[in-house]
Each structure stands twice: as structure tokens, then as C-alpha cells.
Amino acid sequence: NLMQFETLIMKVAGRSGVWYYGSYGCFCGAGGQGRPQDASDRCCFVHDCCYGKVNGCDPKKDFYTYSEENGAIVCGGDDPCKKEICECDKDAAICFRDNKDTYDNKYWFFPAKNCQEESEPC
């Protein structure tokens, strides 16, 4: 669920997902349209696409199971749908970590009017 996603971002990227990515670019936060503005925004685009492929559970509300092994997040549990959600969240958190140096404050609270281009397909 979204609180677990926040926790994973804190653990993996070392920063608050809500603060840094809650309203960033064209895809971080609620909704998403247009073109990703930078690598961090692309992390959110890919995460949105990942959630869009999940069937049979609710990525924003359902709890999943994960553990930490040697500093890595390992998604677990018996429910394959919830495990998919975990993998989406884990991959996004890793993406945020790997692209921290591209984060640009000019995309924080980026106006939606700047996100009118046609979206690329997932």
C-alpha cells in the first residue's frame, strides 16, 4: 500500500517519498499524464505502468509482505498479486535512489498545464 511504498523509499533511497515525490514532474503523485520530465519523473511513470499491470488486488490499499536480507528488499508472501505490488514499489524505490542526482527542484509541484503532451505507452 502507499504507506509501505513510503517506507521502502525511505529505506532504499534515504528520503521521504511523500515530500520529494508526492508532487513532482508529470507522473509523481496522483494521476499522471504527458511526458516524464527527468529520470526521477520517469521512475514514477514506470511505477504507474507497473501498477497498471497488476490484476486482482489494489496497489494503493493492499498490504504486502517483504523482508530485508543483506540490505536488499525481498518481496514475499503467498499472494502473487501482492508480491507484484511489492516488486513495483521496490523497483521504484531503487530507481529513485539511482537517480537522486538528477532530481531538480524546478519539477517539485510542477504545474499540470506543463504536462499536456501525449503520453508515451507503457
From Swiss-Prot:
Give a yes or no for keyword Signal in this entry. no
Q: Which GO terms describe its biological process?
A: arachidonate secretion; lipid catabolic process; negative regulation of T cell proliferation; phospholipid metabolic process
Where, by residue number, is the active site? Answer: H47, D89
Please give the family membership noted in the entry.
Answer: Belongs to the phospholipase A2 family. Group II subfamily. D49 sub-subfamily.
Question: Which residues are listed for Ca(2+) binding in this entry?
Answer: F27, G29, G31, D48
Sample GO molecular function, one term: calcium-dependent phospholipase A2 activity
Q: Which SMART domains match?
A: PA2c
Entry annotated with the keyword Iron:
no
Q: Which Gene3D superfamilies match?
A: Phospholipase A2 domain
Determine the domain of life of the protein's source: Eukaryota
An annotated GO cellular component: extracellular region
InterPro entries for the chain: PLipase_A2, PLipase_A2_Asp_AS, PLipase_A2_dom, PLipase_A2_dom_sf, PLipase_A2_His_AS
The cofactor named in the record is: Ca(2+)
Q: What is this protein called?
A: Acidic phospholipase A2 3
Which enzyme class? hydrolase
Q: In which tissues is it expressed?
A: Expressed by the venom gland.
- What reaction(s) does this enzyme catalyze? a 1,2-diacyl-sn-glycero-3-phosphocholine + H2O = a 1-acyl-sn-glycero-3-phosphocholine + a fatty acid + H(+)
Q: List the PROSITE patterns hit by this protein, alphabetically.
A: PA2_ASP, PA2_HIS
- What biological function has been recorded for the protein in this entry? Snake venom phospholipase A2 (PLA2) that has high lipolytic activity. PLA2 catalyzes the calcium-dependent hydrolysis of the 2-acyl groups in 3-sn-phosphoglycerides.
